[in-house]
């Protein structure tokens, strides 16, 4: 069964690595200029799409952030007796725009981050008067929303990778946002927010070619740009939609006590201490795939600006979504989500039935629990294992090989840091298992280069002295007759029809693709050993059960969420192998009362032993304990026949009751 757990773990790591191997995209998120996000290369190698579990993990992470933000609100505002500047107590503030305040909306578009040219008619994009703060019934659709669409004439600087900003002003009715108009401008009657509306993405170019012909299918223009700008080019991208939300909130916030990340949106007036209405630029539902690059060929850009009121609760959700991951302290390039991962979560939320989505989230939590239990039982099984009878040692070594190939592949493709760490931990666990299946020691007599001690590996006696080693060697010999021809065919196909960065990348890509396609075959040697031993009692059934349940959950996700056909086939073939294990468990049932070929049974060692009555000199019968047999756990019981009990010798002088007849031998399976 070691082969099953190793191959199953490698399959999960391989799919996870494939989902994040190319250049990725990260969102702007915060107000103002953000770090450039990364876009996918124009000629990426063929990679599997992110699996269902990656999509669900993204949803669960967002739910956790939402819960954390909500917990701050349940704590309530800070007490008013907190000391402020000069020792005076801090008091709760109020919204400078009371509910039902009449206000005007002014939207300006400019290439300058700080806007001052209010007299330029070309900069004014939209002006909407007589809006009511907190009105949810006006507008064309009676939802309080308004929108405006227009084509923007973009200047040459924006065409040449420059920035463009949106400046939004809300003023109370009768006032103007221009500070130079003294009669119409009031500081406490004007709220302003701006943001860069284009997004910078890194476009990575990987110089790949056919290693035999030297030809490439990459766009010649892209090759020229890569020669001019290098392998990574930062390009401005555009999305035609953005929503301006004003939060309908009158919470008595206390300055200095607003929990993050909400504190970056609540702006207090320095003189009055009250806070301005909260303006939020909402682009959460803008899918990454809908962004397109801005270049010299575009003379204008379409822009649709929507205005909608936003409740406090929904604003908390969006603010939580825009919160950067806690892993970002490692750097934006180390932890990032791909375009597919970001869009798949949003599409799932938009298109999936709410009941089905709720069921999927619940099952995802169960999947996480099973994943943890499988990991825990796997470690416990190998840590407490004393005998290797019935276990495939070669499968453990093949699992180490699989893990190393996956690790080298994701390092070569510059996958994000979190995936690299998780795969590296998996490699360490696989290496630790080697110490449990072999005797590993440092040979200080035969040193490497005369300096470093040499590692010595030796098979354990419980493996050598049993028939398991013979069956293990036989299984892998038969397996090699299938794997090596398949590996050769796949290597030729990869060399003839796919492009690679170099020979090293070709070797890793070829091995990675081969393991992804045919790795499930390595689960079969354990089936062969079980067949030869006519027993499955040596297998870690708890760990196997958790992994089987997780595989069935993966099947559910694969058919509920849009997934590649090859991934669905991969889940199905793993199910077939697990069903074979279940069939073997059914036909090779374990009888806990039998003693196996190792002299062990599955009886409870604490159970009382049967007693025989022996007559004393006075003729009375006294109980005498019968000899006990060595016991073992139920999982280590075998299907061998029990040994016959020996009869005690009769005394010549005193009569002894005849011993009970031995039970009939049970029928072999």
Curated annotation (Swiss-Prot):
Residues 614-632 have a biased composition (Low complexity). This is Putative lipid scramblase CLPTM1. It comes from Homo sapiens. The modification Phosphoserine is found at residue 601. Involved in GABAergic but not glutamatergic transmission. Binds and traps GABAA receptors in the endoplasmic reticulum (ER). Modulates postsynaptic GABAergic transmission, and therefore inhibitory neurotransmission, by reducing the plasma membrane expression of these receptors. Altered GABAergic signaling is one among many causes of cleft palate. Might function as a lipid scramblase, translocating lipids in membranes from one leaflet to the other one. GO terms for biological process: cell differentiation; regulation of T cell differentiation in thymus. Keywords: Acetylation, Chromosomal rearrangement, Developmental protein, Differentiation, Glycoprotein, Membrane, Phosphoprotein, Transmembrane, Transmembrane helix. GO terms for cellular component: endomembrane system; external side of plasma membrane; membrane; plasma membrane. Widely expressed.
